[in-house]
Amino acid sequence: MGKTAIIVEDEIFVALDLERILTAAGYSVVGIAADRRTACEIGRGCDFAFIDVNLRDGPTGPEIADTLAREHNVKVVFVTANPSQIIDDRQALGYVRKPFSESAIAAAAAIASGGTPPPDAANDVILFGDRGRASTVMSA
């Protein structure tokens, strides 16, 4: 069985683009959520989540990331135009900045699912390191 993902994004065209990219890369998207309640309901049991910071119910992305990671062992990658709003990144692997490329999303999905990102995505995903410092993914 393939890896499963949830997309937490309130802009439907962005969410559908993420879904298209993930599906083409072989992942199964279990749903799209635009708010905290929906994300926590359908996110349980997923392998990883792509989460925006600012959603329909406010800047709840970091709270959702914390809940899904801590309570359900879901790997989290933020997809945001506002990475400076990620105050507490302890529960996330890193982030992809909007606007994103297909290669950035594919690389982030590979990392979140325990794989290796493609070499052409070397600088597309920012990983969180110790003490909140970020570093780019380096190609092999």
Describe the function of each predicted region:
Residues 9:
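Conserved acidic carboxylate
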Residues 51-69:
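Conserved phosphotransfer microenvironments
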Residues 79-80:
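Hydrophobic/aromatic residues positioned on beta-strands within the core alpha/beta folds
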